[in-house]
Amino acid sequence: MERYLYNSGIKKIEYYLKRYNLLDLKISKLSEFADDYNYSNGYNKWLKNKCSSLEEDAIRNIEIEQRIYKIRKWQSLINAILEHYKSKDKVKYKFICLKYFKKLTPIKIQERMNLTEQEQDDLTKVILNFILSVAIKKNMLKEVEV
């Protein structure tokens, strides 16, 4: 775990957790963008301009597909973690739902779950470290020398 940029991994995990409810929308928008782009910039434009826009279109489509694949991979990981916590640890599951999906403040979470802010911080670290370890095992984070 030393070879991975810890802070960057945690930030990435929190990014996907906070935007989990919007991931399907993001995937569909990227797919629509790729489809619309293909129809509006077809072969006719390439023939008229006599340039390498066809290559640019192909590169852009590949980049969009890579982004969609990456988002789906993170979505799948989060789904698996949620299912794991839902069956094994209801407290962590509820905490994730309240903090990241409903975006409640620590005070509201304290009222609902009877957890102090320190306990919430500790629970956050445990959850994020668990997700980080799973993401590392699945090669979802890039290796960096520390």
Regions found by a protein language model. Name each.
Residues 1-86, 139-146:
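N-terminal interaction/assembly modules
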Residues 95-96:
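A short pre-motif secondary-structure segment
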Residues 102-119:
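Helix-turn-helix DNA-binding module
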Residues 116, 120-138:
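DNA major-groove recognition helices of helix-turn-helix
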